[in-house]
Swiss-Prot record:
<dbReference type="GO" id="GO:0016832">
    <property type="term" value="F:aldehyde-lyase activity"/>
</dbReference>
<protein>
    <recommendedName>
        <fullName>Probable transaldolase</fullName>
        <ecNumber>2.2.1.2</ecNumber>
    </recommendedName>
</protein>
<dbReference type="InterPro" id="IPR004731">
    <property type="entry name" value="Transaldolase_3B/F6P_aldolase"/>
</dbReference>
<keyword id="KW-0570">Pentose shunt</keyword>
<keyword id="KW-0704">Schiff base</keyword>
<keyword id="KW-0963">Cytoplasm</keyword>
<dbReference type="InterPro" id="IPR013785">
    <property type="entry name" value="Aldolase_TIM"/>
</dbReference>
<dbReference type="GO" id="GO:0004801">
    <property type="term" value="F:transaldolase activity"/>
</dbReference>
<dbReference type="GO" id="GO:0006098">
    <property type="term" value="P:pentose-phosphate shunt"/>
</dbReference>
<keyword id="KW-0808">Transferase</keyword>
<comment type="function">
    <text>Transaldolase is important for the balance of metabolites in the pentose-phosphate pathway.</text>
</comment>
<comment type="similarity">
    <text>Belongs to the transaldolase family. Type 3B subfamily.</text>
</comment>
<comment type="pathway">
    <text>Carbohydrate degradation; pentose phosphate pathway; D-glyceraldehyde 3-phosphate and beta-D-fructose 6-phosphate from D-ribose 5-phosphate and D-xylulose 5-phosphate (non-oxidative stage): step 2/3.</text>
</comment>
<dbReference type="GO" id="GO:0005737">
    <property type="term" value="C:cytoplasm"/>
</dbReference>
<dbReference type="InterPro" id="IPR018225">
    <property type="entry name" value="Transaldolase_AS"/>
</dbReference>
<dbReference type="InterPro" id="IPR001585">
    <property type="entry name" value="TAL/FSA"/>
</dbReference>
<dbReference type="InterPro" id="IPR022999">
    <property type="entry name" value="Transaldolase_3B"/>
</dbReference>
Length: 217
């Protein structure tokens, strides 16, 4: 499974990248706003930092302008993936850009119907939003499973990029079902290391080391 980091914070990306935990990055207008930086400037810095795909989202809602914005974003770096919303115009933009040989991430997916359309339009990635489905008392994992089944049935190459990740369980469940990629905030990825028994075991080891006067250096 590939790990993408869902942030525009350079230091957070760098920390995880140094550990080999970053296969790509996803951004959106809200994350860019939170960073307080120019979209082109911060996206370029992210692209210089990581080798994998960096999703940069268009801001337009009509296909023609989405395509123009996508081409502008593609000028930033070779590893840019253009991110478009799952609307009819977004699918038109996806088809045009992928036909030109570019990578496209179709975002804001909430149904397998939508995911099927995105795959037919040539999407590189489909981003189903797990957490937002959970917010309205639907099981986001059911959607991941439905998309996986449909894509496997017909051999679609579109990768399932599980998004709106809120918890470690979201990551693990996505992995169990067979999502190709997860994108999560740095804090959620880092929290995967935590377990109370690990802490308890380490405390016991440290107590024994102190009692025995063990030193390595």
């Amino acid at each position: 499974m590939k790990f993408f980091v869902d942030t525009a914070e350079i230091d957070a990306i760098a920390e995880l990248n140094d550990l080999g935990m970053v296969d790509g990055v996803t951004t959106n207008p809200s994350l860019i706003k939170k960073s307080g930086r120019d979209i082109i400037e911060v996206t370029k810095e992210i692209c210089d930092l990581v080798d994998g795909p960096v999703s940069a989202e268009v801001t337009a809602t009509d296909a023609e302008t989405m395509i123009a914005e996508g081409r502008k974003l593609l000028e930033i770096a070779d590893n840019i993936t253009v991110k478009v919303p799952l609307t009819w115009d977004g699918l038109k933009a996806c088809k045009t850009l992928t036909d030109d040989g570019h990578k496209v991430n179709v975002t804001l997916c909430f149904s397998a119907n939508q995911a099927l359309l995105a795959a037919k339009a040539g999407a590189t990635f489909i981003s189903p939003f797990i957490g937002r489905l959970d917010d309205v008392n639907l099981d986001g994992m059911d959607l991941i499973e439905d998309i996986r089944t449909v894509y496997d049935n017909y051999g679609f190459e579109t990768e399932i990029l599980a998004a709106s990740i809120r918890t470690v369980n979201h990551i693990l469940d996505s992995a169990r079902i067979g999502a190709d990629v997860i994108t999560a905030p740095p804090a959620v990825i880092k929290s995967m290391v935590n377990h109370p028994l690990t802490d308890k075991g380490l405390d016991a080891f440290l107590a024994d080391i102190k009692a025995a006067g063990i030193k390595i250096l």
